[in-house]
């Protein structure tokens, strides 16, 4: 992977990893992660695609947004990144918070998106689920960083899960606390922002989760795919929130089929 930096407006920079040649595939990770969190997909797809994995604002080496930034600000950031890359319409995939950003870009700037993929996204949370995630965002604001609870929620005890868990733990331990807090608040408040725009998405849309992800549920996944004009829902058995790391072969297979669909 080649480490690169985009120069954005207002003296901000966006860091990304780049590998491979071909159609552009842009990847956006979730809250608390970094560009490397797509490592199985970068390795696999860079054989035939031009893969660009971005550090979200305030994560990795990318400049943070303002502390009060909302989901729309992260979407504007992604739009500016795609413009600055100057690759034309891209295949855009997001995980978790990255999925909300991907949805926002696809709804507001369809001219920039050839295909879109949402992995472990959220859609119209229940009241209880929304309250729980807002409470977690508030705890972060107060400086309480709980690493073990999400790790227990995201990973089981298989060998591949233990390996992925160690990498994710390291990223969380080294997270920029203010950038993490800003992104988590936007994530907590963002599930409704573009939810009603799914019916406007006309490009091929892959929506994927695991059966055992309690917050990005199979029901949400099916609803999103059903709303899109050309949506496909895939729910992988016995997988949780970090499915791209714990079931990379199945995720790569689903994404490969998505990339081969005709826009």
Swiss-Prot record:
Q: Does the keyword Metal-binding apply?
A: no
| Primary enzyme class | hydrolase
Molecular function (GO) terms listed?
hydrolase activity, acting on carbon-nitrogen (but not peptide) bonds
Q: Pfam families from the xrefs?
A: Abhydrolase_6
Please name the InterPro entries in this protein's record.
Answer: AB_hydrolase_1 (IPR000073), AB_hydrolase_fold (IPR029058), AB_hydrolase_sf (IPR050266)
Enzymatic reactions: (E)-2-((N-methylformamido) methylene)succinate + 2 H2O + H(+) = succinate semialdehyde + methylamine + formate + CO2
Q: What is its EC number?
A: 3.5.1.-
Query: In which domain of life is the source organism classified?
Result: Bacteria
Record keywords, A-Z = Hydrolase
Name the residues annotated as catalytic in the UniProt entry: 96, 120, 241
- Please give the subunit comment from the record: Monomer.
Entry's family note: Belongs to the AB hydrolase superfamily.
Q: What does this protein do?
A: Involved in the degradation of the pyridine ring of trigonelline (TG; N-methylnicotinate) into succinate and methylamine as carbon and nitrogen sources, respectively. Catalyzes the hydrolysis of (E)-2-((N-methylformamido)methylene)succinate (MFMS) into formic acid, succinate semialdehyde (SSA), methylamine and carbon dioxide.
The protein here is known as: (E)-2-((N-methylformamido)methylene)succinate hydrolase
């Amino acid at each position: 992977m080649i480490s690169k930096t985009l120069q954005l407006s207002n003296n901000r920079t966006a860091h990304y990893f780049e590998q491979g040649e071909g159609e552009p595939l842009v990847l956006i990770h979730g809250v608390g992660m970094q560009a490397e969190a797509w490592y199985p997909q970068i390795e696999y797809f860079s054989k035939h695609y031009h893969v660009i994995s971005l550090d979200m604002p305030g994560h990795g080496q990318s400049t943070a947004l303002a502390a009060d930034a909302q989901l729309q600000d992260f979407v504007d950031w992604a739009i500016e990144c795609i413009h600055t890359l100057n690759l034309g319409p891209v295949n855009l995939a997001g995980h978790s918070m990255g999925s909300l950003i991907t949805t926002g870009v696809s709804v507001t700037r369809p001219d920039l998106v050839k295909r879109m993929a949402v992995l472990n996204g959220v859609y119209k949370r229940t009241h209880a689920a929304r309250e729980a995630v807002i409470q977690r965002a508030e705890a972060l604001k107060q400086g309480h960083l709980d690493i073990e609870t999400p790790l227990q929620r995201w990973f089981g005890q298989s060998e591949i899960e233990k390996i992925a868990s160690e990498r994710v733990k390291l990223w969380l331990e080294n997270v920029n606390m203010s950038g993490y807090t800003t992104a988590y608040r936007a994530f907590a408040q963002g599930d409704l922002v573009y939810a009603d725009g799914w019916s406007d998405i006309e490009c091929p849309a892959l929506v994927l989760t695991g059966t055992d992800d309690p917050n990005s549920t199979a029901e949400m996944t099916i609803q999103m795919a059903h709303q899109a004009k050309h949506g496909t829902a895939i729910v992988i058995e016995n997988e949780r929130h970090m499915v791209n790391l714990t079931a990379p072969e199945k995720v790569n297979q689903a994404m490969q089929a998505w990339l081969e669909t005709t826009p």
